[in-house]
Amino acid sequence: MRKLASALLKPGTLGRWFVAGVYHHPLRFPVALCRSVVATKKLTGHIFPLRVRLGIGQTLRVSVGCKSRVTLTGNLLVNSWGGSNIPSSISCADESSLAIAGDFEIGPNVHIEVVRGANLTLGGKRHSSASGITCNSRIMVENSVAIGADCIIAWDVYISDSNWHEITGMTRCAPVSIGDHVWISHGVSVLKGAVIPSGCVVGAKSLVTKSFSTERSLLAGIPAKEIRSGMEWSR
């Protein structure tokens, strides 16, 4: 029994989430549980394992199109930040693909849109204490966006691989790649063709528009440039 209790209450497990919810919010937790079941069903097509877990008062709007592929080997955690309960959303159009490899957390007013035939990969948590998007941010995918493990995305961040409109003489879209253990600060925009290597930090309000190759570097500016190398950071 002791081993079972220890396993159930291990950080990040369904048991710990359930027990904490019932203990701290006995009246409101059933609503969060029902919303989590519905969101899991919409995203994955089944309700067990319960991969989507909503915090108290949080709402996740889910739309999954025909023949789309959603793979959650980790858990999608929807929590509050700064007391906000603005709904977040995930939209996967027909024949699109969304894969979340490890636990990934999103806050309020986070919107993820994957259009027809596009692919989005989120590495989630692997070694760090958490990985995810704080709040008020948007990811829009027309072709391919890959975000590695143990990444932190702050608030007011925009990530997209497309212009979303045709501009004469310019490529409409190009894949975006973000490595492992990357910290994207407040107000950053990551646009088509951007490559951010593992271990990098992107300074606040920066605009990333091209491919970088040096890991563990500080990228900052409009457009972003390599400011410093040999960066070390942690949560």
For each predicted feature, which ranges?
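ABC-type ATPase nucleotide-binding domain
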Residues: 154, 185, 203
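Glycine-rich NAD(P)-binding loop of Rossmann-like domains
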Residues: 170-179
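Beta-rich strand-turn-strand
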Residues: 136, 140-141, 188-201, 206-211
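Domain-scale signature associated with acetyltransferase and cell-envelope carbohydrate enzymes
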Residues: 1-158, 179-181, 198, 214-215, ...
